[in-house]
């Protein structure tokens, strides 16, 4: 119960106080659609489709061209919409910051019929129904991405599971089985099944694996009848999925021809292909029964495919490609980007959502026509129904003369929109499509129709608005790209644009017909965010991301010499402003011992900037509105404090007090509570300031005639999506009646201000219908060969036969349908009493179910014989893989060196998820047994505070004083210990003294801090004197040495270190074990990854080397030299262990050959047993010949290829003609023998004769005597080949040696990793021993913690009771004062009454009677024993002891009625007296109880201190036991100094005097200091001499340059006289006379240029990938922060609930307002019911947090 009180104490007061604001606008019209949504259109009835844009649900009639809308949630938007299959309902999925819902509506009444709750955290991104509409699936957006299945009838949640960790675009039920679902989105596709498990029905998902195919976004897919899935991709391929793997990819064309024209090998290879669509495929749908597949994408085409062909296709290559037959295609438009498609049955049309902002109507094509190839020329073309802006609207400018707005968007168009009607009047497409970032009308223009348009490409356009179109007056390009900001001064004479750190200035002509450039300068600071003009100082104000504000003086035309350059020197000044208003910190009402800690904590939590400057808006009175990127940081400034030529504020004086006018303080806050400003604009009339804030929020600030801002802001109604629809621009209309805003959701929203009359729409202007010409498409004939044509004819003939049979069946079916329709019409014509219902007239729906059941049974029967064995094998294989393969991040593999002298092995690295999960379970069990983790955290915090106090009292003798950081730490601890008492006294004096001003307090604090800094800095300099000349360099070097020592030793802080004080527990040790396991895994994994990269590099290197080695072998063959070995290099099986699980075609062929050889050896062995001649009888020689030839074809082929290559080179070089002829003859002989049959006896003799003839021919060729010229040519060629072989051998050897050197470095790294792993395993063993020890102490630790918690709770309860009693004392004192004051007033009134009602002589007597005290019996409610309570009045001093009888007699000549009134008033006075007495008695009793509670609080404080001391002692005992364990510390051999007497290393290292630190380091440091001093002196002398030499060289350089200029002029004249042109003599001298050499050089240059281009492309790709990685990291970080914020919100809600419960209980038993027994019983029942509801909600939340995501709808309903 202490948490709420603590939260109240630490609650910060608000920075600004605002008056209560109300919404002062209402939605009037909106125009546009969100064209970038997937599944953005859904068909309703008729020609109406359902769409969602921003926070509006739209009903679009594509025939009439009208749009009706319904607003979504106020503080969010619409995430997705879907239509029920019955088309009688539709659902709207909300998107809100918290608790989004799914609302179901009926159509066409649009009334809400139901609600689905708790399906997502912030909103939904996709929604779909199953075929019969009984179930609905939704997918949440970030941060949860939950897939939820709902029951439509009960509105309950059926199943739930985490879908993916990225955006999900589409979710889909299978039309054939509602238990199958598919979801797809950013970079993934996932397949879901509703599986029955032993815990019930659950969702099980498989993530699709793209394999070799590039990962793609998937937005369109369908499920086939056999469970396969067909999806689209970004590359334009259609993908067929089976399970979670890709079975086939469909393309329009595949190039299967090899580069060299030979047939492809058995290895899977990649082919070039033409995709099915040019661009992404966004739509994939099945048409009527699943016979035809329709796809559509960004190329604007509909294409149709036969499903029966796709589902059985088998691809070839990697990825597997297949070319299906395209049944037809429909072109929507050449520039269309199809995003979504829906089919309107009532009008028989497709409605297409185009990303360019167009809704198209496409005539529907029947599947029969598609199968009959009748869609080559559609009868009707696609018609645009509605046209809007494509994508986001990035800028807008309102017309100063009428109710229109000019918008610019991402699609590169400028549009004029009438927001009253609303409708688009006309548009202009820019010459170069680009993003329009800003628009502005010229108010000084007489016609007020000219405006500026700035584009992101760097172009500035001057445009004029006409009656029917825009006119481009001119365009300028001051920047190459990246134009982001622009501003026009108030007089509209100057323009400045900003892009990429430069600002360009223009002059605007008086007639606004052109711009004249002045010049540009570079901005001194990066990251410009906003810009505005300061007309008073002729400066351009620029805000930056760093929070600074610069004023750049605008140049004039005379200041820039444009004949030389447009660049001029930037003249700037820093504007000094305080971004947030100063707030005086109030002292919290806490105890004296806790006040200092509270103030320090508040100062740490408070962020003091700087914030990025987001907006600068000039105001009418000359001031500026400046907004920063923080909450409520929008102020009004004068901007008078400036620092010329400065980028930083000047430093403060030594006193720390800001001088006057150091920075400008804010004049007025212009924001509102919890709003963060983003942009602003001023209305044309100057009456309104429009402020755009984060989260699509807006507010208006109204100004009076003098330009002063009124205090009451006006809030603007929500017009755009609060979560995903930022506002790009907003402003009021020319008459200040309307507020128009545009945003990234593509909407133009107009709102009417309260109290204003809506403007009338303009009168329509008749326009001519544009003429459209039909495009003539030239037919193209596809060339076919005779075989292809024959196959095509056969296939068509078979298809025609099938189609004929199908048509016969369809004709019969048509007759049945006609008869059925006739029966329906007859039934409809009957009377209502005789008419059959729809259920009664249904024709045998059981037939379909029986057929489905029969098919299912057949499939099950076919699977039964092998089902058991197959399941066993699958389970066995899965278990083995899970146990030995799948649990490994890296398997062990070797990388051998080329020299074969050494090899490096990787680490067999298993995943650590299992062990970490086991440790986490143990942690959960330990935390669960402690019953309250928060208590443990509080205890740990208390223990840490005690331990820190103990650490401050210990001696720092063990601290390292060898570094500056160690000395600083020691000095700080010494100063804290010495000044602890003085600081307490100073704090007490400060608390008792008067409250100083903020400036004086800061000054005194800074003086104390600086005095303390000077003190310990002086001592530090004395100790660090030996570390001269530069302590910072020495500290850095020593810190680096410490880091190296830490990495080598493993643990920086030893347990014997005095700064090591912890509260060890079993949970902490388990967490340390988890971190250690992750470290070990990372070490293994990182090394294995590096070695894997090296292995892959070796594999690539082998391919490169084999090319050179193959050339060497060819040279050896030419030279006939077999002594020079050049065998191919390849990876061994040990280096590629992963291939043992791969099954390739080459491996199967090799296995088949091996099996054939084994069978052949067995047959040979059997024949050998039959005796001599058995082989001759069965043709054994032929068999042997074939056997030997089995290995020769490849060899022969390679020899043939080599021979052909040699022949070509010989012809080129005129060498080896005879040898080539000889090889060709031999090759032809072998080729002839290769194709023959197995030899018979005659064939064998003929072969022998041919061999003899070949041998004789060979001998004759060899005996031919060559001429001297031929011998010389042969010798030259031999020398050339030897040189080439030597060069190639040297190159190969160098590449091998370089690889071996890198592999050797990996070998050394492996040794280091081995050592680190040994230390890590030893450390893990130490942590496990510590964990076992801490388990023993765990019970006692828990008991001490429990006793501490009890004592602390008692103390807190006592303090709370004391606070309540003190408040009660204050209330009672105030009540007594009120009663006394009322008594005095009443007495004065009675005295006046007596003096006016009785004679003067009787007034004293009657007054005495009135003031007399009499004995009265107390009220019956007072049951005390003292009934005669007599009180005396303070003003009555007379004797009251006379007889009472005469007092009751009315005096003579007095009215009896007045006398009775006096008696009654006396009773009233006595009642006052009794009440005051009773209150005083209660006050005394309360004060007595306070004294008792104070004594009890002292006892509780003593008990808490005793518990803390016991916990501290117990923690010390635990640390002592842990320190008794032996710790392994890794040392270097150079650190072992102690040897025995003989100079040998001792036998054991367990000696105290064995390990010492070397003192050579200190000697080396002294030597280094002296060397540096000498070097410094020498370098100063050298610097002086070099300066003098530089000056002399500069003078000489000037002279040489003048002489060089003269010679250049002479050479120029000489070349003109001699050659007539300028000739490059160096190129002329370097060129040779050979044309072939020049051609080769040119080819080499072109090749190098292509390589450079490829390298630049790769570098750009790497940069893009790095950017994506950085964005993913930021995105995940934001998700973690969001989770933390939500957890904080949940805790605050629980605290508020507990506090409200306490208030209700306190009110129930309040002593002032006592409730009746019935009220108390009712409150008890209410509290009990609320507690039950809270418990049920907590149970539900805990259930939703479970991993499985299973929810029982029945249990939830019962809980409600």
Swiss-Prot record:
Gene Ontology CC: axoneme; motile cilium; nuclear speck
Please give the coiled-coil regions recorded for this protein. 1348-1389
Name where it's found. Cell projection, Cilium, Flagellum; Cytoplasm, Cytoskeleton, Flagellum axoneme
InterPro entries per the record?
WD40/YVTN_repeat-like_dom_sf (IPR015943), WD40_repeat_dom_sf (IPR036322), WD40_rpt (IPR001680)
Q: Where is the composition biased (Polar residues)?
A: 1181-1190
Q: Which domain of life is it from?
A: Eukaryota
Q: Which SUPFAM superfamilies match?
A: WD40 repeat-like (SSF50978)
Q: Write the record's keywords in alphabetical order, separated by commas.
A: Cell projection, Cilium, Coiled coil, Cytoplasm, Cytoskeleton, Flagellum, Repeat, WD repeat
Q: Its Gene Ontology biological processes?
A: axoneme assembly; cilium assembly; cilium-dependent cell motility
Listed Basic and acidic residues bias regions: 1155-1165, 1194-1205
Q: Where is the composition biased (Acidic residues)?
A: 1425-1444
Region labeled Disordered — which residues? Answer: 1155-1224, 1420-1444
User: Does the keyword field hold Coiled coil?
Assistant: yes
Q: Gene3D superfamilies from the xrefs?
A: YVTN repeat-like/Quinoprotein amine dehydrogenase
Query: According to its UniProt record, what is one Pfam family this protein matches?
Result: WD40
Q: Is this entry keyworded Coiled coil?
A: yes
Matching PANTHER family, A to Z? CILIA- AND FLAGELLA-ASSOCIATED PROTEIN 43-RELATED, CILIA- AND FLAGELLA-ASSOCIATED PROTEIN 44
Record's family? Belongs to the CFAP44 family.
What does it do?
A: Flagellar protein involved in flagellum axoneme organization and function.
Which protein are we looking at? Cilia- and flagella-associated protein 44
The taxonomy runs: Eukaryota, Discoba, Euglenozoa, Kinetoplastea, Metakinetoplastina
Gene expressing this chain: CFAP44
């Amino acid at each position: 119960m202490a948490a709420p009180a603590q939260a109240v104490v630490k609650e910060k007061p608000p920075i600004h106080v605002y008056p209560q604001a109300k919404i002062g606008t209402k939605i009037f019209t909106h125009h546009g659609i969100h064209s970038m949504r997937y599944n953005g259109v859904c068909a309703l009835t008729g020609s109406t489709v359902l769409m969602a844009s921003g926070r509006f649900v739209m009903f679009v009639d594509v025939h009439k061209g009208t749009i009706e809308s319904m607003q979504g949630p106020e503080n969010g938007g619409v995430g997705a919409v879907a239509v029920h299959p019955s088309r009688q309902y539709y659902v709207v999925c909300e998107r809100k910051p918290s608790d989004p819902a799914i609302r179901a509506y009926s159509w066409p009444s649009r009334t809400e019929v139901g609600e689905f709750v708790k399906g997502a955290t912030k909103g939904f991104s996709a929604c779909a129904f199953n075929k019969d509409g009984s179930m609905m699936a939704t997918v949440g957006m970030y941060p949860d991405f939950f897939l939820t299945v709902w029951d439509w009838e009960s509105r309950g949640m059926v199943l739930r599971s985490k879908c993916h960790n990225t955006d999900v675009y589409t979710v889909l039920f299978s039309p054939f089985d509602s238990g199958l679902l598919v979801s797809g989105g950013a970079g993934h596709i996932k397949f879901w099944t509703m599986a029955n498990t032993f815990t019930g029905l659950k969702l099980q998902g498989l993530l699709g694996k793209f394999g070799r195919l590039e990962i793609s976004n998937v937005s369109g897919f369908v499920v086939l009848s056999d469970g396969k899935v067909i999806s689209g991709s970004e590359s334009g391929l259609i993908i067929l999925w089976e399970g979670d793997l890709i079975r086939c990819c469909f393309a329009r064309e595949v190039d299967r021809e090899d580069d060299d024209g030979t047939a492809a090998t058995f290895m899977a290879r990649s082919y070039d292909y033409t995709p099915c669509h040019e661009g992404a495929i966004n739509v994939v749908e099945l048409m009527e029964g699943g016979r035809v597949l329709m796809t559509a994408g960004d190329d604007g085409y509909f294409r149709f495919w036969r499903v029966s062909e796709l589902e059985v296709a088998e691809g070839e290559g990697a990825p597997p490609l297949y070319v299906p037959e395209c049944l037809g295609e429909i072109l929507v438009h050449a520039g269309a980007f199809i995003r979504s498609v829906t089919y309107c049955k009532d009008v028989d049309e497709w409605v297409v959502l185009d990303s360019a902002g167009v809704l198209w109507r496409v005539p529907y094509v029947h599947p029969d026509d598609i199968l009959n190839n009748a869609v080559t020329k559609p009868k009707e073309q696609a018609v645009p129904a509605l046209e809007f802006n494509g994508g986001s609207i990035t800028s807008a400018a309102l017309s100063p003369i009428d109710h229109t707005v000019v918008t610019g968007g991402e699609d590169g168009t400028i549009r004029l929109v009438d927001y009253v009607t609303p409708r688009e009047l006309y548009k202009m497409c820019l010459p170069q499509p680009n993003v329009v970032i800003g628009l502005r009308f010229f108010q000084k223009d007489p016609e007020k129709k000219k405006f500026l348009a700035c584009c992101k490409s760097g172009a500035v356009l001057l445009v004029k608005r006409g009656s029917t179109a825009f006119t481009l007056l001119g365009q300028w390009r001051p920047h190459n790209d990246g134009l982001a900001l622009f501003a026009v001064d108030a007089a509209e004479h100057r323009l400045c644009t900003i892009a990429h750190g430069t600002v360009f200035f223009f002059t605007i002509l008086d007639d606004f017909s052109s711009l004249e450039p002045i010049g540009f300068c570079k901005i001194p600071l990066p990251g410009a965010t906003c810009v505005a003009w300061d007309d008073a100082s002729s400066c351009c104000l620029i805000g930056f991301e760093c929070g600074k504000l610069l004023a750049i003086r605008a140049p004039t035309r005379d200041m820039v010499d444009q004949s030389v350059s447009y660049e001029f020197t930037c003249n700037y000044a820093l504007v000094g402003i305080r971004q947030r208003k100063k707030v005086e910190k109030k002292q919290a009402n806490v105890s004296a011992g806790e006040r200092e800690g509270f103030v320090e904590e508040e100062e740490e939590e408070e962020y003091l900037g700087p914030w990025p400057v987001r907006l600068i808006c000039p105001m009418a009175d000359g001031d500026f509105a400046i907004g920063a990127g923080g909450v409520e940081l929008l102020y009004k400034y004068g901007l008078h404090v400036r620092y010329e030529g400065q980028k930083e504020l000047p430093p403060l004086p030594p006193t720390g007090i800001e001088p006057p006018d150091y920075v400008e303080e804010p004049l007025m806050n212009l924001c509102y509570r919890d709003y963060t400003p983003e942009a602003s604009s001023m209305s044309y009339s100057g009456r309104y300031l429009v402020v755009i804030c984060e989260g699509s929020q807006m507010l208006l600030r109204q100004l009076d005639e003098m330009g002063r801002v009124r205090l009451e802001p006006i809030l603007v109604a929500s017009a755009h999506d609060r979560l995903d629809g930022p506002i790009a621009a907003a402003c009021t209309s020319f008459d200040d009646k309307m507020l128009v805003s545009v945003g990234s959701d593509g909407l133009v929203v107009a709102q009417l201000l309260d109290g204003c009359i809506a403007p009338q729409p303009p009168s329509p202007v008749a326009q001519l219908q544009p003429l459209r010409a039909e495009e003539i498409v030239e037919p193209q004939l596809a060339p076919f060969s005779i075989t292809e044509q024959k196959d095509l004819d056969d296939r068509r003939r078979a298809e025609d036969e099938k189609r004929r049979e199908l048509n016969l069946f369809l004709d019969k079916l048509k007759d049945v349908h006609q008869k059925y329709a006739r029966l329906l019409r007859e039934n409809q014509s009957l009377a209502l009493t005789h008419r059959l219902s729809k259920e009664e007239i249904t024709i045998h729906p059981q037939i379909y179910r029986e057929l489905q059941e029969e098919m299912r049974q057949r499939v099950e029967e076919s699977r039964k014989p092998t089902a058991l064995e197959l399941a066993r094998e699958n389970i066995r294989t899965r278990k083995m893989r899970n146990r030995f393969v799948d649990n490994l991040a890296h398997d062990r593999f070797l990388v051998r060196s080329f020299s074969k002298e050494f090899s490096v092995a990787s680490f067999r690295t298993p995943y650590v998820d299992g062990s970490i999960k086991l440790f986490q379970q143990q942690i959960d069990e330990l935390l669960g047994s402690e019953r309250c983790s928060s208590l443990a955290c509080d205890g740990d915090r208390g223990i840490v505070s005690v331990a820190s106090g103990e650490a401050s009292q210990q001696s720092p003798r063990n601290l390292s004083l060898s570094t500056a950081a160690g000395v600083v730490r020691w000095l700080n601890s010494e100063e804290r210990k010495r000044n602890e008492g003085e600081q307490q006294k100073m704090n007490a004096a400060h608390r008792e003294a008067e409250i100083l001003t903020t400036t004086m307090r800061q000054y005194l604090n800074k003086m104390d801090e600086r005095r303390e800094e000077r003190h310990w800095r002086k001592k530090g300099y004395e100790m660090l004197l030996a570390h001269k000349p530069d302590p910072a360099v020495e500290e850095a070097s020593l810190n680096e040495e410490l880091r190296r020592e830490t990495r080598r030793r493993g643990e920086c802080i030893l347990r014997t270190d005095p700064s090591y004080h912890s509260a060890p527990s079993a949970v902490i040790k388990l967490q340390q074990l988890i971190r250690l396991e992750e470290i070990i895994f990372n070490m293994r994994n990182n090394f294995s990854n590096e070695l894997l990269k090296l292995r892959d590099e070796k594999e690539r290197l082998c391919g490169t080397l084999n090319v050179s080695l193959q050339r060497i072998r060819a040279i050896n063959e030419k030279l006939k030299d077999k002594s020079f070995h050049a065998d191919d290099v390849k990876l061994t099986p040990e280096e590629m262990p992963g291939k043992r699980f791969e099954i390739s075609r080459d491996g199967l062929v090799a296995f088949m050959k091996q099996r054939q050889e084994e069978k052949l050896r067995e047959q040979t062995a059997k024949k050998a047993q039959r005796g001599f001649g058995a082989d001759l009888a069965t043709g054994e020689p032929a068999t042997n010949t074939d056997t030997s030839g089995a290995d020769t074809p490849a060899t022969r082929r390679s020899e043939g290829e080599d021979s052909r290559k040699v022949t070509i080179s010989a012809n080129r070089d005129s060498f080896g003609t005879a040898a080539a002829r000889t090889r060709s003859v031999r090759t032809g002989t072998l080729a002839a023998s290769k194709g023959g049959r197995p030899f018979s006896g005659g064939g064998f003799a003929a072969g022998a004769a041919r061999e003899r003839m070949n041998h004789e021919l060979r001998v004759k060729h060899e005996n031919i005597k060559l001429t001297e010229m031929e011998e010389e040519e042969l010798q030259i060629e031999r020398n050339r080949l030897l040189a080439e072989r030597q060069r190639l051998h040297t190159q190969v050897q160098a590449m091998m040696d370089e690889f071996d050197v890198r592999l050797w470095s990996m070998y050394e790294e492996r040794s280091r990793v081995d050592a680190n792993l040994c230390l890590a395993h030893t450390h893990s063993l130490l942590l496990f021993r510590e964990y076992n020890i801490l388990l023993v102490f765990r019970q006692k630790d828990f008991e001490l913690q429990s006793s501490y918690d009890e004592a602390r709770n008692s103390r807190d309860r006592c303090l709370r009771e004391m606070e309540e009693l003190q408040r009660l004392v204050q209330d009672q004192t105030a009540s007594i004062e009120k009663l006394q004051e009322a008594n005095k007033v009443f007495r004065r009134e009675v005295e006046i009454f007596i003096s006016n009602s009785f004679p003067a002589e009787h007034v004293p007597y009657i007054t005495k009677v009135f003031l007399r005290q009499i004995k009265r019996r107390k009220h019956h409610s007072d049951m005390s024993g003292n009934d005669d309570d007599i009180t005396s009045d303070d003003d009555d001093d007379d004797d009251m002891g006379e007889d009472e009888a005469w007092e009751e007699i009315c005096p003579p000549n007095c009215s009896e009625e007045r006398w009775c009134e006096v008696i009654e008033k006396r009773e009233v006075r006595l009642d006052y007296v009794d009440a005051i007495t009773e209150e005083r008695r209660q006050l005394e009793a309360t004060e007595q109880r306070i004294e008792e509670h104070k004594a009890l609080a002292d006892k509780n404080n003593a008990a808490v201190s005793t518990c803390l001391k016991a916990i501290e002692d117990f923690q010390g005992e635990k640390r002592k036991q842990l320190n008794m364990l032996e710790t392994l510390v890794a040392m270097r051999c150079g650190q072992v100094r102690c040897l025995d007497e003989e100079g040998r290393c001792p036998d054991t290292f367990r000696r105290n005097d064995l390990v010492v630190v070397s003192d050579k380091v200190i000697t080396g440091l002294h030597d280094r200091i002296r060397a540096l001093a000498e070097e410094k002196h020498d370098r100063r002398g050298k610097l002086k001499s070099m300066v003098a030499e530089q000056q002399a060289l500069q003078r000489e350089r000037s002279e040489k340059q003048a002489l060089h200029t003269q010679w250049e002029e002479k050479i120029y004249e000489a070349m003109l006289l001699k050659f007539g042109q300028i000739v490059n003599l160096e190129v002329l001298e370097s060129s040779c006379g050979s044309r072939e050499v020049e051609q080769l050089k040119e080819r080499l240059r072109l090749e190098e240029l292509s390589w450079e281009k490829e390298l630049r492309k790769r570098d750009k790709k790497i940069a893009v990938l790095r950017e994506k990685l950085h964005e993913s990291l930021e995105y995940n970080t934001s998700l973690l922060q969001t989770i933390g914020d939500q957890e904080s919100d949940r805790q605050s809600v629980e605290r508020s609930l507990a506090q409200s419960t306490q208030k209700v209980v306190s009110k129930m038993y309040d002593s002032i307002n006592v409730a009746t027994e019935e009220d108390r019983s009712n409150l008890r029942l209410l509290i009990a019911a609320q507690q039950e509801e809270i418990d049920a909600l907590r149970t539900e939340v805990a259930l939703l947090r479970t991993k499985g995501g299973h929810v029982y709808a029945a249990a939830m309903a019962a809980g409600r």
